[in-house]
Amino acid sequence: MPKMNVESFNLDHTIVVAPFVRLAGKMEGANGDVIHKYDIRFKQPNKEHMDMPGLHSLEHLMAENIRNHSDKVVDISPMGCQTGFYVSFINHDDYEDVLNIIEATIKDVLNATEVPACNEVQCGWAASHSLEGAKEIAQTFLDKKAEWHDIYGEAQ
């Protein structure tokens, strides 16, 4: 296959083993700032996916809470394939710390009593949320924390 412009289109989705967290890209700005983009893969590509209400609530919860653990977060957003998220950090390339930040954020999800910004004023599809769905996704991901380093299932 020809090399594509989008990094994830060059990833062989048939050989990765979810869950995992991998560095998906690095970009340096004109002034020396560096953005590191991580692929947080919750579900096995082409085998399973997150249901939209749970994914949507997980997005709100992670977007709000991850910033309590790092001031280096640029963005966190869901993948259209519904198997994971991308999180980008500026001037922060410590993979182990990124894992710690993700873990703390997932624990925040599990302790949440409501979904932030779950209303028509602050959300574009406020009817599509599930706190319980988000917690189920988060718990399954956290239960497999030992696998987050292992992108290709080599340790199994």
From Swiss-Prot:
Positions contributing to Fe cation binding: 56, 60, 123
Cofactor binding annotation: Binds 1 Fe cation per subunit.
Essential cofactor(s): Fe cation
Keyword Metal-binding (UniProt): yes
EC number: 4.4.1.21
One BP annotation, GO: quorum sensing
EC class of the enzyme, as a word: lyase
Gene3D superfamilies: S-ribosylhomocysteinase (LuxS)
Catalytic activity: S-(5-deoxy-D-ribos-5-yl)-L-homocysteine = (S)-4,5-dihydroxypentane-2,3-dione + L-homocysteine
Keywords attached to this entry: Autoinducer synthesis, Iron, Lyase, Metal-binding, Quorum sensing
UniProt-listed InterPro entries: LuxS_sf (IPR037005), Metalloenz_LuxS/M16 (IPR011249), S-ribosylhomocysteinase (IPR003815)
Keyword Glycoprotein annotated: no
Pfam families: LuxS
An annotated Gene Ontology molecular function: iron ion binding
Known role: Involved in the synthesis of autoinducer 2 (AI-2) which is secreted by bacteria and is used to communicate both the cell density and the metabolic potential of the environment. The regulation of gene expression in response to changes in cell density is called quorum sensing. Catalyzes the transformation of S-ribosylhomocysteine (RHC) to homocysteine (HC) and 4,5-dihydroxy-2,3-pentadione (DPD).
Subunit relationships: Homodimer.
Homology family: Belongs to the LuxS family.
HAMAP family in the record: LuxS (MF_00091)
Listed name of the protein: S-ribosylhomocysteine lyase
Gene expressing this chain: luxS
